[in-house]
């Protein structure tokens, strides 16, 4: 880019501002976390867009379609425990509420991993609308039916939510709690202290004016 210019004209070349690294939910995503090779779907329009094919699982989205159709019906407590990895769902639901993920809704903006043991794991995806003062969408998926149907599951969820709130946001000061420390640590990569101008300033000039 030219060292000087007038207004936005100096940013009209190949500079696109600050970008993030995105980890795709494919076989490498599973291997990095020590998870067995299984089907992974990005959920769009309630359909499963496959991102990974498990060697022992359906080569069509029939496993996702069956799970989706069944969780939208009333199911037994045992069905929920056998088909949805409840501890993962409790964490997924809690964290989405903490970070105000308002673009999440049923059929969109999340990923589902099908473990060969039969359990489904919801995974966050499309996280560009966080911590904003808007309702937009409900910020939940219909897996929440499990909590409404069974008080036992709702109590387990509330216990996990309380645990995460105490850990992450129990301290209301600007740099408090684990989440405040994490944000402070990460921000130093792009906005190191002691520098008069950083990449944050470049990004602000690129998009905010």
What are these model-predicted stretches?
Residues 2, 6-98, 102:
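Internal "kinase-insert"/substrate-recognition segments embedded within catalytic cores
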Residues 7, 60-61, 65-106, 110-209:
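Middle-to-C-terminal accessory/interaction subdomains
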């Amino acid at each position: 880019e030219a060292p000087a210019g007038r207004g936005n004209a100096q940013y009209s070349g190949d500079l696109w501002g600050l970008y993030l690294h995105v980890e795709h939910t494919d076989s490498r995503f599973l291997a990095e976390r020590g998870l067995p090779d299984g089907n992974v779907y990005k959920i769009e329009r309630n359909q499963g867009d496959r991102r990974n094919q498990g060697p022992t699982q359906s080569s069509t989205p029939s496993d996702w379609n069956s799970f989706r159709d069944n969780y939208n019906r009333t199911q037994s407590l045992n069905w929920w425990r056998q088909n949805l990895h409840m501890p993962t769902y409790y964490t997924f639901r809690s964290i989405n509420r903490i970070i105000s993920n308002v673009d999440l809704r049923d059929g969109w903006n999340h990923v589902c991993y099908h473990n060969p043991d039969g359990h489904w794991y919801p995974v966050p995806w499309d996280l560009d609308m966080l911590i904003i003062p808007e309702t937009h969408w409900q910020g939940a998926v219909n897996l929440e039916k499990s909590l409404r149907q069974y008080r036992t599951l709702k109590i387990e969820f509330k216990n996990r939510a309380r645990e995460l709130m105490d850990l992450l946001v129990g301290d209301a000061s600007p740099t408090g709690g684990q989440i405040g420390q994490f944000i402070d640590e990460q921000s130093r990569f792009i906005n190191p202290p002691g520098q008069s101008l950083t990449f944050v300033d470049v990004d602000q000039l690129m998009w905010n004016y």
